[in-house]
């Protein structure tokens, strides 16, 4: 009798994706983040579902309902903090996953890469809308500031902002629609993830050497299932340590104050994972210019397949490009730090320099380094 795993229409799909999938024999721990992102998404959908059972999306009761979840619901505090800190873990895994793709040239599979960039955008939109839901001070003012950016669009800007708000300011209509979108988007993310994997499995995984690995494949199970389980355990350990020891480490104290349209917090800033983009936005004095720079700071990822001028795929044997890559990483850390600082003398200049460096490295220095390496290798 033929194995049901290989004949049943549904189980066959799972088999070809997670069991009998041919995988390169040398992929490192940097390839674990895909499965960890899947785990993060599952955690977020499950905890989010239980939070939605107790949350009310009304301006009068939203803040109280979150308090109620933390105080009165059985293990509500745990579910709430798993959801909030799960988002941080999600973004840590996302940034490492994208960084791995940049370092090892995974963007050469451009369908997989571009769907990944779209996924990044959708996850960022979901996280932003989720941050508005507790209706604290930073929720309200964050929503006001970020939605207001659309007013920079010529001619239709002002009308578009009021359309998104559902009124003349961030209010009940805004909160309700953000809750609706925040609920539906994770399922859209899950669907896009399937497409992401579909395209990946058309070509097979890249590997650290950036070479074709068809001659040396191993089955995904048991080799990479056991490896993924180790990653999963480490992620859960890190997440639970964060939740149980310092759940508010990455949050903003202002969000424990109920939203008040009449009092603006001294420093409006988003969650830590948006700070690098926020710093780029703030470093340009012109509103429209800032918004364009903000959008382009993520969209620029889609240009990587076009900017790849090296004859080698991976950076593993390209010391010059490696050096530039790590400068880019340091620059992103600098931008993240600047995004959380007030807009005053030293920070403004540092932010502007870091923003210029970010775009210069990607558009100019990395391609130039690739050409120099080609020349040095007489290629």
Swiss-Prot record:
Q: Which residues bind heme b b562?
A: 83, 182
Q: Name one GO molecular function term.
A: ubiquinol-cytochrome-c reductase activity
Gene Ontology cellular-component terms listed:
mitochondrial inner membrane; respiratory chain complex III
The membrane-topology field of this record reads: Multi-pass membrane protein
Cofactor note (record): Binds 2 heme b groups non-covalently.
The entry marks the following residues as binding heme b b566, namely: 97, 196
A Pfam family this protein belongs to?
Cytochrome_B
* Cofactor list: heme b
Provide the protein's localization: Mitochondrion inner membrane
Keyword Metal-binding appears in the UniProt entry: yes
Q: InterPro entries from the xrefs?
A: Cyt_b/b6_C, Cyt_b/b6_C_sf, Cyt_b/b6_N, Cytb/b6-like_sf, Cytochrome_b, Cytochrome_b_C_euk/bac, Cytochrome_b_N_euk/bac, Di-haem_cyt_TM
Q: Which domain of life is it from?
A: Eukaryota
Locate the transmembrane regions by residue number: 33-53, 77-98, 113-133, 178-198, 226-246, 288-308, 320-340, 347-367
From the UniProt record, give one GO term of the biological process aspect.
Answer: mitochondrial electron transport, ubiquinol to cytochrome c
Keywords, sorted A to Z: Electron transport, Heme, Iron, Membrane, Metal-binding, Mitochondrion, Mitochondrion inner membrane, Respiratory chain, Transmembrane, Transmembrane helix, Transport, Ubiquinone
Record-listed a ubiquinone binding positions: 201
| Biological role stated in the UniProt entry | Component of the ubiquinol-cytochrome c reductase complex (complex III or cytochrome b-c1 complex) that is part of the mitochondrial respiratory chain. The b-c1 complex mediates electron transfer from ubiquinol to cytochrome c. Contributes to the generation of a proton gradient across the mitochondrial membrane that is then used for ATP synthesis.
State the PANTHER family in the record: CYTOCHROME B
Tell me which family the UniProt entry assigns to this protein. Belongs to the cytochrome b family.
Description of how the protein assembles with itself and partners: The cytochrome bc1 complex contains 11 subunits: 3 respiratory subunits (MT-CYB, CYC1 and UQCRFS1), 2 core proteins (UQCRC1 and UQCRC2) and 6 low-molecular weight proteins (UQCRH/QCR6, UQCRB/QCR7, UQCRQ/QCR8, UQCR10/QCR9, UQCR11/QCR10 and a cleavage product of UQCRFS1). This cytochrome bc1 complex then forms a dimer.
Protein name as it appears in the record = Cytochrome b
Organism of derivation: Urocitellus parryii
What is this organism's lineage? Answer: Eukaryota, Metazoa, Chordata, Craniata, Vertebrata
Gene encoding it?
A: MT-CYB
